[in-house]
Amino acid sequence: MIYMTRCETAYTETPTLIDDVPYPQHAHIIPETFKNAKRGMAYPPHKLIDRVVTEDVLAYVENNPVEGKTGFIFAAGNQGWMGNNGRYDKNPEAELHYKVKLPFIVLTNIYAGRIASMFGVHDHVSTDASACASSLKVLMDVQNLINNFGFDRVIVLGAEDGVNNLILEFFGESGASLQYKDEDKRQPSAFDDINGGFFIGQGAVLA
């Protein structure tokens, strides 16, 4: 049997209605940083990580050891990690790529390694950047590691660098996220049966 023992989030439990965009919709945001993120300014990933990888969480893992293998997966699928954000030209991530000749997506693996070492995880460390909703995809990876590869515990950190206009418009136009005008239709959600649809930022969590 697979079950979750603890969960931490970096955003407010109640989603915020963003209605000054072409496709008005609710989204889970960090209120004090959303103003800059909305304009397309990257929110440093390590700042977001620090919000959920707290001393309490680290102490919980340390004080509740499990026998056997422990894995860690960093779920980060936002294209901002790759320095590919169309909202602004002077992209600090792309500049980093140019100056140090390091593809920015590689930093997800660096972050994953650093965070895993904080938890004392060495059996399996990986990055899941398969899609913008990597935190949903990673649930299947957790099940696979436990059922087929003999893992007893898997720690998952999902992080996005910020909700901005580009993402809201892309998800809204494609119908991937739930628009405000459709909320009363009670569409099924990928995460739960309460919201009635997918809200941007709903997959950012540490479990």
Model-derived regions: residue spans:
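Short, high-confidence coil segments that cap the C-terminus of an alpha-helix
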Residues: 150-154
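Acidic/serine-rich, low-complexity amphipathic helices located in mid- to C-terminal regulatory regions
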Residues: 159-161
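Short conserved active-site loop signatures built around small residues
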Residues: 135
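Short-chain dehydrogenase/reductase
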Residues: 139
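Conserved "HGTGT" condensation-loop signature of ketosynthase/thiolase-family condensing enzymes
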Residues: 1-124, 144-148, 174-199, 205-207
